[in-house]
């Protein structure tokens, strides 16, 4: 999950510039995504998440472990592993954009809180993209127990990182 976990904060850190929706509105008159979703954020977030995954692949190939736990293996070979890592990183940001689209439809402004949805949108996006490109890998690695753990721990991690982002001035709201 590290590629997914890291793509969002790095998109916020390195984002800015031209919005993905180009300032356009949907048929309801509201912005499609809003100013918070930019090309620079999208590509830098995917890149940073992908690099984090590549580091994990490298560490795993060398038998690295943390507290007796082996690093994840993202696929049977490097090509498959790179595809999974890219799916995790990009799926996270597309999940976040999907959520933003629906928040705009609900009339919620940029930064408005939508509890649990704000914390799990990128997880769902990462899982969907990963399942689409590597269903066998996904099913064998994201067991019910792992998924439940991710669903429980992610909101806590999300809140912590958002508070840090708020304190250092990267985010305008601490959620």
Curated annotation (Swiss-Prot):
Gene Ontology MF term list: CDP-2,3-bis-(O-geranylgeranyl)-sn-glycerol synthase activity
ATP-binding in keyword set: no
Cofactor: Mg(2+)
Compartments where located: Cell membrane
Topological relation to the membrane, as annotated: Multi-pass membrane protein
UniProt-listed GO biological process terms: glycerophospholipid biosynthetic process
Superkingdom field: Archaea
This enzyme's EC code(s): 2.7.7.67
InterPro entries: CarS, CarS_archaea
Catalysed transformations (reactions): 2,3-bis-O-(geranylgeranyl)-sn-glycerol 1-phosphate + CTP + H(+) = CDP-2,3-bis-O-(geranylgeranyl)-sn-glycerol + diphosphate
Primary location: membrane
Cross-referenced HAMAP family: CDP_archaeol_synth
Protein name as catalogued: CDP-archaeol synthase
Originating species: Methanosarcina barkeri (strain Fusaro / DSM 804)
């Amino acid at each position: 999950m590290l590629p997914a976990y890291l793509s969002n904060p790095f998109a916020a850190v390195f984002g800015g510039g031209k919005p993905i929706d180009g300032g356009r509105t949907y048929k309801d008159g509201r912005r499609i995504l809003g100013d918070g979703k930019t090309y620079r954020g999208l590509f830098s977030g995917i890149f940073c998440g992908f690099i984090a995954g590549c580091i994990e692949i490298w560490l795993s190939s060398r038998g690295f472990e943390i507290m007796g736990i082996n690093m994840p293996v993202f696929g049977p070979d490097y090509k498959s592993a790179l595809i999974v890592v890219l799916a995790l990183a990009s799926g996270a940001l597309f999940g976040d954009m999907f959520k933003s689209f629906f928040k705009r439809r609900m009339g919620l402004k940029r930064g408005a809180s939508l509890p649990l949805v704000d914390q799990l949108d990128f997880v769902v996006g990462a899982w969907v993209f990963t399942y689409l490109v590597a269903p066998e890998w996904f099913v064998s690695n994201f067991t019910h127990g792992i998924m439940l753990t991710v669903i429980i721990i992610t909101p806590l991690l999300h809140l912590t990182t958002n508070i840090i982002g708020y304190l250092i001035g990267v985010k305008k709201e601490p959620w």
